[in-house]
Amino acid sequence: MGTTTMGVKLDDATRERIKSAATRIDRTPHWLIKQAIFSYLEQLENSDTLPELPALLSGAANESDEAPTPAEEPHQPFLDFAEQILPQSVSRAAITAAYRRPETEAVSMLLEQARLPQPVAEQAHKLAYQLADKLRNQKNASGRAGMVQGLLQEFSLSSQEGVALMCLAEALLRIPDKATRDALIRDKISNGNWQSHIGRSPSLFVNAATWGLLFTGKLVSTHNEASLSRSLNRIIGKSGEPLIRKGVDMAMRLMGEQFVTGETIAEALANARKLEEKGFRYSYDMLGEAALTAADAQAYMVSYQQAIHAIGKASNGRGIYEGPGISIKLSALHPRYSRAQYDRVMEELYPRLKSLTLLARQYDIGINIDAEESDRLEISLDLLEKLCFEPELAGWNGIGFVIQAYQKRCPLVIDYLIDLATRSRRRLMIRLVKGAYWDSEIKRAQMDGLEGYPVYTRKVYTDVSYLACAKKLLAVPNLIYPQFATHNAHTLAAIYQLAGQNYYPGQYEFQCLHGMGEPLYEQVTGKVADGKLNRPCRIYAPVGTHETLLAYLVRRLLENGANTSFVNRIADTSLPLDELVADPVTAVEKLAQQEGQTGLPHPKIPLPRDLYGHGRDNSAGLDLANEHRLASLSSALLNSALQKWQALPMLEQPVAAGEMSPVINPAEPKDIVGYVREATPREVEQALESAVNNAPIWFATPPAERAAILHRAAVLMESQMQQLIGILVREAGKTFSNAIAEVREAVDFLHYYAGQVRDDFANETHRPLGPVVCISPWNFPLAIFTGQIAAALAAGNSVLAKPAEQTPLIAAQGIAILLEAGVPPGVVQLLPGRGETVGAQLTGDDRVRGVMFTGSTEVATLLQRNIASRLDAQGRPIPLIAETGGMNAMIVDSSALTEQVVVDVLASAFDSAGQRCSALRVLCLQDEIADHTLKMLRGAMAECRMGNPGRLTTDIGPVIDSEAKANIERHIQTMRSKGRPVFQAVRENSEDAREWQSGTFVAPTLIELDDFAELQKEVFGPVLHVVRYNRNQLPELIEQINASGYGLTLGVHTRIDETIAQVTGSAHVGNLYVNRNMVGAVVGVQPFGGEGLSGTGPKAGGPLYLYRLLANRPESALAVTLARQDAKYPVDAQLKAALTQPLNALREWAANRPELQALCTQYGELAQAGTQRLLPGPTGERNTWTLLPRERVLCIADDEQDALTQLAAVLAVGSQVLWPDDALHRQLVKALPSAVSERIQLAKAENITAQPFDAVIFHGDSDQLRALCEAVAARDGTIVSVQGFARGESNILLERLYIERSLSVNTAAAGGNASLMTIG
């Protein structure tokens, strides 16, 4: 959309008045001026007289209308953002205000509007009962429709078999290779209890299908992939496997055909004639996913154009009401249809919409703009507004728009549409639907921490909303042609009665979905003389190939299979019809009586804030599609940019400013964000003294009080979110969505660790380490910085924080918040500076009792070597908690949905300009789908916008500095010179291109490799490597990933559970993600941290982390923490039983050693290895946290009792033991039972540290321990933790012997959230 700058001269007094007024309403002066112009114009356009203005300045008439020639102005941060804020009319502002209105408020307002007058209510109930009775008792539909309906009712989504059918339907038809298709069929069918369905259905087809599935299931359930082919051939001859594949394929296609009118528009028009003769009308929908590339959007545009020509010719002049129409999805017409890309939508999508509408007008067929996700509603209204005022469309009433009754904004949208119809002098076609994205709306609000849901959480509230909205639509027949889309007999009957008996053609119509609503509407469409209601019904008819059908089909399966749907309940003969056709207003009032309040949300759907239960708040997010939130953010950002940000050393006593260095915005060198001064050696020394002196004071503070201070810090941080976003965007180059996520993560850390110490810690028993150094990275300069400090403070330690050199300003704000919350100044101190100076002085000091570090593997290794020779007062090694990088891979097989893969790859590889430890570095694509996936991925990359993150439109910001840019570009050039195909793409834009020259930008890059092993080290930036693999070589691929030595994150996209189990079971990786992106781990939901070269553990935001920051604690402490968590969520301890069998053998052997036997029992009870826990999280996601044994533990002792103590501890967790090959240990191995000795490996004592092991337990004196620590730290590769004890001690920390694995599965990946849809 083109823009023009118009200048106006104002005196200082007026300018100040504008500024003051804008500040008062939390808006920018720029917004206020724009809004004033907009409101005045609206008033002028809506009335014949000119609204009177207050007296203007006398000199106003002499002012020039021309804009003054702009002078070269200094860079003003966030001015672009402010200019992207849209003014709103009163009716549009009311829509935005109702976006996430509390349900109690929204439902209370609707009830009276929805209530039917008593006589109408009685008539509606009577008619609904008749319709439902006929529907239930009519002969089962014959042919394909009856077969499919029978299948769907028998296999509901609450059964494992129903979900299996849904997964099959979603994926089977798109898989190109037979091997993967067979694997999917085997996977979904082999575990089902098909036998329980035999004979339950009256339909012969369902019973035949069940026998077939049972037969198939029995064939495959006892065989794994390798032996399946042989077994099948043995049982049913050589044609067996193709026979099963063909049978299931046919069943899936049958289901597909039930819901699709035709594969082409010509076929669909031909198939429609039969029902058109019965009085039905049609609106055709061209199937497909939302466009991700320009090519996709162009293909959909052509498809729509061809369809309009075909429908128009078939309509043959019948007009918009009597003839067929078309429905279009705006997300199909543009790859970036979102609020953030507003200008592109208006400049590129709108002309396509206009062109299609003009084509529809040419044939006089109705064109409906389909409703989509809630964050697209208001931009779709802007497009509609523009369309309604096109001169070429004046006087034509074929423009249609779809509204969703489940949205709280719906009644206000109707008010706006009525106003729009009035202003544009036309009658609009408005289709009222209940809404098809309910489960994903719930999930998104929970994940984003928004203040509420845009939709109702109870179906009955949507039914009430539908009636209230229907009454509004029927009230203005001259302005609105209502189209009521419903399959619910009561809703249908209520509208029939409300609309009155004197129906006239063109008054209104009903609508239903092809393949779902015809049995109901055959009673409605037709003459009264034939016992029908003589009301028109238009069938919403999808058109497309079986491959394009998938996403649509799954939505239909979800709707039909959900036990709350009318279509599902009508078939359930145990449900009384009176209950089925109950008035929703009455149902809501009954609920209110039971619950004591009207409109309470569904008890099983907590508000986003309460997602984790009452013990911990979910951090609040910020909705970047909400115009009011954007305006408020814009005001705060402009204010933030005026602040003079500084980062000085923050010690117990204030320090002098001294000579400062500028902190430069990496996207814009002209923007000086603030100033920093490095801590001097003297200041570092002072800080160390203060940390030592204040440590006892802070430790003496009760845990509940420490927790309260951290909670206060979280609240303060959340209240300052907008200001913090401003610094993160300018100092760290974060986009707005990234900056919001960063503040939220910091808040989550504060809440999480505070909750743990409040509930589980006591000062008498949980003793801290002492002064702890926290060295944080620039890529998460607030989240990781706060997480480290919050954990150390929660555990009772004093903290010396050294932020990254590039990002000291946001760190200073973080410390200021902690101090304001009540942390004493000497307990937490900030020491800005370089690692080589400030970092080295801090970590090299003997008074430091622990080091927390996030950064490169190389620096972590140096730190470990630096502290290896130091022991604390108790003679224990100084702990290093290091979280380092990874060579993170994503494995994609041919059953994955390409569109989903591409969206997740873009987020995982290029979000934050690839500057996340967790970012995707190597994409592994199965051969059969590699070309197709890469084509779409390249197209999607070309749609990304790279530029200054201070604009809402930016997807990819800068890399952190010129050194990072040079390193990344060097790698890309090296790959080019090796002949590797390199693809770089980003959306070309002259404004962005100017910034690319001055800022430190690297375009998203795709590099194809021959082999995974070609990549030798992590490339920290927006560079994605691609390797192809053969399906049969998946085990070798996983071995290659493990061989890299890194183990931070790994993604897998597949619909096959066997593949998921194979990958997650054999990959040595800390955080695993299935069918979702692999970045953005959430505190307490996906505890984060790697293994091998990727980190030491424990995982940040997990239950073990705080225990690493204690010097002493009860041996049962961790068990207490886990038991509290286990009270809410089940524990799977199947693996534990298998792991502890050698321990049981040792316990029996120790019958004459009561002390050892007691230790075996104690360790066995406390051991948690082999346990898996479900963690809280958003709906549509399953998050588990598993504790596994470390592979091999080096145990060193010179006393038999200590050696056996170590052995008992290691066997309790299920690890192998590495012993020195000396007389003591050889003798023990001979004496031990074979079940135990099998777990022990001996190695020569002189080079034992050269052997592979991943943990160490030592008993002996401090000099020996020091030497051992130094020898272990000197090794290359993984940093290994050493536990050191005096002879005779038995308090071995079992959690140091665990590997933690987080697994996050997107359970809604197959197209919808079955468990949420069935909660009632």
From Swiss-Prot:
Pathway noted in the entry: Amino-acid degradation; L-proline degradation into L-glutamate; L-glutamate from L-proline: step 1/2; Amino-acid degradation; L-proline degradation into L-glutamate; L-glutamate from L-proline: step 2/2
Region of interest (Aldehyde dehydrogenase), residue spans: 653-1119
GO BP annotation list: negative regulation of DNA-templated transcription; proline biosynthetic process; proline catabolic process to glutamate; response to oxidative stress
Reactions listed under catalytic activity: L-proline + a quinone = (S)-1-pyrroline-5-carboxylate + a quinol + H(+); L-glutamate 5-semialdehyde + NAD(+) + H2O = L-glutamate + NADH + 2 H(+)
Cofactor(s) recorded in Swiss-Prot or TrEMBL: FAD
Active-site residues per Swiss-Prot or TrEMBL entry: E883, C917
Domain of life: Bacteria
Role according to the record: Oxidizes proline to glutamate for use as a carbon and nitrogen source and also function as a transcriptional repressor of the put operon.
Complex and partners: Homodimer.
Family to which the UniProt record says this protein belongs: In the N-terminal section; belongs to the proline dehydrogenase family.
Protein name: Bifunctional protein PutA
Gene: putA
